[in-house]
Swiss-Prot record:
It comes from Lachnoclostridium phytofermentans (strain ATCC 700394 / DSM 18823 / ISDg). The gene is ureB. This is Urease subunit beta. It catalyses: urea + 2 H2O + H(+) = hydrogencarbonate + 2 NH4(+). Keywords: Cytoplasm, Hydrolase. Pfam families: Urease_beta. The keyword Hydrolase applies. GO terms for cellular component: urease complex. It is found in: Cytoplasm.
Length: 106
C-alpha cells in the first residue's frame, strides 16, 4: 500500500437497508434558493419549503452523506426520505423536536 492509496471493493454498497422510506413532493414557495443537506431533519427545513410536514418527522433525505438537494424558487421536487436510525433523538436544527422522535410520530 502506498501513502494515501485507496483500496476499494468491487461489490455494490447498500445504504439504509431495512429502514422505512417515503417519497414526497416539496415546493419552494420562497424567493430564495434553499439547500437541504443529507442528514438535516426534513421536518424542520425552511418554512418556505411546502409539504406535509407531519409525515416527515424523524426522516432525512435518502441521498449519500455530505450531499444536498437544492430547491430554487418555485421548484417542485419529489424526494425520497429515510428514517433516522440509532436512538432517534433529535436536537437543534430549528428546535421543533428537541427530544425523542418516536414519541412524536402518528
Amino acid at each position: 500500500m502506498k501513502p494515501g492509496e485507496y483500496i476499494l471493493k468491487n461489490e455494490e454498497i447498500t445504504c439504509n437497508e431495512g429502514r422505512r422510506t417515503i417519497k414526497i413532493t416539496a415546493v419552494n414557495t420562497g424567493d430564495r434558493p434553499v439547500q437541504v443537506g443529507s442528514h438535516y431533519h426534513f421536518y424542520e427545513v425552511n418554512s418556505a419549503i411546502q409539504f406535509n410536514r407531519e409525515e416527515t418527522i424523524g426522516m432525512h433525505l435518502d441521498i449519500p452523506a455530505g450531499t444536498a438537494v437544492r430547491f430554487e424558487p418555485g421548484d417542485s421536487k419529489e424526494v425520497s426520505l429515510v428514517d433516522y436510525a440509532g436512538e432517534r433523538f433529535v436536537y437543534g436544527f430549528n428546535n421543533k423536536i428537541d427530544g425523542k422522535l418516536d414519541t412524536r410520530r402518528n
